[in-house]
């Protein structure tokens, strides 16, 4: 993998910059997570492949969604969702330029209302983690919620 001047792999640097919302300290913290690019890709994969409620069970044992990795996954998912909203409104606002084509393609399967509601749901589930709600329950509720919102906001 190519490395940037900071010694961070280019894919991680790009993902970290997208996830950090302009905060350098946060970008450095995120870029030290070697699994960040994988987590970002996994968020896109899950949104692409979550089609029906029976699909939820197949993601419950995903290592990207386990207790230790879930906060980073929620960050990556938030960025993907924000970029999907940008793809529907103003493509110049997409932050994850390295995944622009995938994000634009993925966004076609969601309405703008659905994306906004799913982003809200992600933040609600993030709050539950801070109240020590079990990660499996958070993941299950999140994935089922995504399906429900996507269906209701067609």
Where are these regions (language model features)?
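Charged, glycine-rich active-site and insertion segments that engage polyanionic ligands
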Residues: 1-76, 80-154
């Amino acid at each position: 993998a190519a490395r940037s001047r900071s010694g961070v792999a280019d894919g991680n640097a790009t993902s970290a910059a997208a996830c950090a919302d302009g905060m350098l300290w946060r970008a450095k913290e995120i870029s030290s997570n070697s699994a960040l690019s994988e987590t970002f890709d996994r968020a896109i994969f899950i949104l692409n492949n979550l089609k029906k409620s029976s699909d939820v069970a197949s993601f419950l044992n995903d290592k990207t969604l386990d207790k230790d990795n879930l906060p980073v996954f929620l960050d990556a998912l938030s960025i993907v969702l924000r970029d999907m909203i940008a793809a529907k409104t103003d493509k110049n606002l997409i932050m994850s330029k390295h995944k622009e084509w995938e994000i634009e393609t993925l966004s076609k399967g969601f309405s703008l209302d659905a994306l906004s509601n799913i982003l809200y749901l992600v933040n609600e589930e993030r709050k539950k983690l801070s109240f020590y709600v079990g990660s499996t329950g958070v993941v299950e509720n999140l994935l089922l919620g995504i399906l429900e919102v996507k269906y209701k906001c067609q």
